[in-house]
Amino acid sequence: MQDQLRADECCKYLKALGEPERLRIVECLQGGPKTVSEISRDIGSAIANVSHHLKQLRFAGLVCGERSGRNVIYSLSPAFAGKAAGKAPLKVLDFGCCRIELGKK
């Protein structure tokens, strides 16, 4: 039963990352917190499109947002994002069932 719950939870995260635009957003946020406008500019996508995908990433728990005046500053969820040992620019999303390395070429 526990394995089934863990698999279901992991699938939720992987499904959220299954859209190329969402993966680009997560990769963009590995550089640090950003507003929707900054993300939109950095990945070359419309603000409305970025907002839609951020909503899905927030729902899955991969991204969190904090209001700052009129803006919301988005960042990778601390529960999943961390530095890989010895490789400062590389970020890892650790879901417990699997790990995804971002920024590795």
Language-model features: locations:
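Amphipathic alpha-helical dimerization/coiled-coil segments
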Residues: 1-5, 9, 78-105
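Alpha-helical residues within the helix-turn-helix
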Residues: 41, 58-59
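A generic structural signal for short beta-strands and their flanking turns/coil linkers
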Residues: 32-35, 61, 70, 96
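N-terminal helix-turn-helix DNA-binding core of bacterial DNA-binding proteins
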Residues: 9-46, 72-81
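Beta-hairpin "wing" of winged helix-turn-helix
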Residues: 59-68, 75-76
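Short, hydrophobic-biased segments on the C-terminal half of alpha helices
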Residues: 54-55
